[in-house]
Amino acid sequence: MATIHELHKKLVNKEISAVELTNAVIAHKAKVEPTVHAYLSDSHDRALATAKLVDEAIAKGEAISPLAGIPGAIKDNICIKDEPATCASKMLENFVPPYNASVIERLQDNHYISLGKLNMDEFAMG
């Protein structure tokens, strides 16, 4: 398993593309998700679109942030515009925020790749 720093180097050195890395994580997720049930929702299309933007920036020789092109996920109590934010609660099962949390704005500004929302104890009370 590689660190974020190691993956960043591989992206910058064009040893792997952000799209390839994102697809690899999506494939691994598909294998383990039926057993672990970690995700409440996914955003693969948005993730791949961001990965493509990162690859284009690298191809142009632009500097990228250390988080650019790095796939991961966000706990379900963090608001992402137009994605469900249920806090793993039935009470909020239909809530879709019209805004991003500040942390999401920062991650998106740095082209972090979110694959979806992660399960958790209801309202993070566990």
Regions found by a protein language model. Give the residues of each.
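Short alpha-helical functional segments enriched in proximate histidine and acidic residues
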Residues: 28, 32, 50, 54, ...
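Short, polar/charged, Gly/Pro-enriched helix-capping and turn/loop motifs at alpha-helix termini
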Residues: 36-39, 61, 121
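Residue-level detector of short coil/turn "hinge" positions at structural boundaries
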Residues: 17-18, 64, 114
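Short glycine/serine-rich loop/turn segments
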Residues: 68-126
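Conserved SET/PR domain catalytic loop and adjacent active-site segment
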Residues: 15, 62-63, 83
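Flexible, acidic active-site loops/lids enriched in D/E/S/T/G that coordinate Mg2+ and/or position polar
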Residues: 44-67, 74, 93, 97, ...
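Generic non-transmembrane alpha-helix signal with a bias for helix starts/N-cap capping motifs
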Residues: 4, 58, 100-101
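An N-terminal boundary/leader segment
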Residues: 1-49
